[in-house]
Amino acid sequence: MQNPAPAANLPREWIDPATGHRIVQLSTEPGTNSLYFTQYAYTAGGTKLLMTSRRGIDLVTIATGEIEHVHEGHVGRVIQTGRRTGAIYYDQGGFVYALDPATRTSRQVAKLPSNGTAFAINCDETLAAGSYTVGETDHPELAPRRPQPPPGGYKPGDPMPGGDNYPDKHAMMDRRLAARLPMVLFTVNLQSGECKDVLHTTDWIDHFQFSPSDPTLLMYAHEGRQWKLDRVWLLRVDGKSQPMLVHQRTMRMEIAVHEYWSNDGQWIYYDLQTPLSEDFWIGSYNVYSGKRIWYHLPPNHWSVHYNTSPDGTLFSGDGSDPDPAVHYAAQKDAKWIFLFRPELIVNQPGETPDQENMIQVARMIPERLVDLSKHDYSLEPNGNFTPDGKWIVFRSNMRGPIEVYAVEVAKAK
């Protein structure tokens, strides 16, 4: 990658002295963000990454670092890039728009229900999924009490505080869960504009993710403090099935959280703790065979988010803060971008005849990629693999302002 030097004479590319891996700063404007780790953010062909900046929407060519500004101005919410066309979908003013990166023009593709928000686009770009709250939507007592910006707002170049964790977050989640507000999960057809109510519930539902390969299969989450509920669910949005629970807790204080799809849509992965803050796994479930594999993590390697390489052979973790006020599962010396290589634990002779129906266990062999000792984890790094599997993209405030970075999976020569 070739990039101009950023302000303050900081290098845009360097070898991390603690790990020997090459790091590149992809963004050039302070305050630039990558998307949440489950939101697909690559254009068709996988060569360009979507980033959001104060100016609007940018694309960066991963191989060269070249940045294209493709949309001027703030949009309500970037949903993802389309897996088929590479269009950038966003939700603004009650409508879903598709931005063509080549022409830099947007077109309105669907009108949302009143109070509706779109969260996911399916793999063939025919449906969007979202939710809305039924009836009265103004509940200030349930709103997050986030840190407020300074008078006049943030100025270009100002460090912007991360909004992923804040002092009132856990109490807010308890208030919202207890409220049992009626909600609707809906789909909207991006060709005809037809809206369908798919699920009515008083559970707090969120984190909608369509399968990367199956256009009617949707994963979603029951929100709230994770040890109080069974979180990860699957649903056919064509009405041909009832919601199916992916992981059922069997232990007090057990949690399954931060779920995501494998690149081929075969597996669901999630952060599994048995119990919270004590024993750490990456749980997995094959949606077609029902097979389960639990990958055990060594101490002090728990990460806020995990991700899996496109070929399914490697995993990443974006580390965690040692302060339990920031993360329940506080770990010592875990402020790193990690690479994990899975190793199946070999079955011993004489196992029971029904062992094929049991959970397969594996261990993770860790490697440190990026030293995040100066990163403030109130901003979650949201690490994810590039489509070629050669880089892990993440965001960080480790050098002050929020910027977007990539670390090379292979160690520098």
Residue spans of the language-model regions?
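Structural motif
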Residues: 56-59, 94-98, 137-143, 180-184, ...
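Blade-loop segments of beta-propeller domains
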Residues: 36-38, 54-97, 112
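Blade/loop signatures of beta-propeller domains
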Residues: 1-24, 174-186, 352-360
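Loop/turn-rich, solvent-exposed surfaces of beta-rich toroidal or solenoidal domains
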Residues: 271, 277-280, 296-364
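Hydrophobic beta-strand positions that form the internal "hydrophobic ladder"
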Residues: 49, 87-88, 127-128, 217-218, ...
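Blade-level signature of beta-propeller repeat domains, shared across WD40, Kelch, NHL, RCC1
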Residues: 380-413
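Beta-strand-rich domains and repeat architectures in extracellular enzymes and scaffolds
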Residues: 2-13, 18-55, 208
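Asp-box/WD-like beta-propeller blade repeats and closely related beta-sheet repeat scaffolds
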Residues: 74-76, 83, 90-184, 193, ...
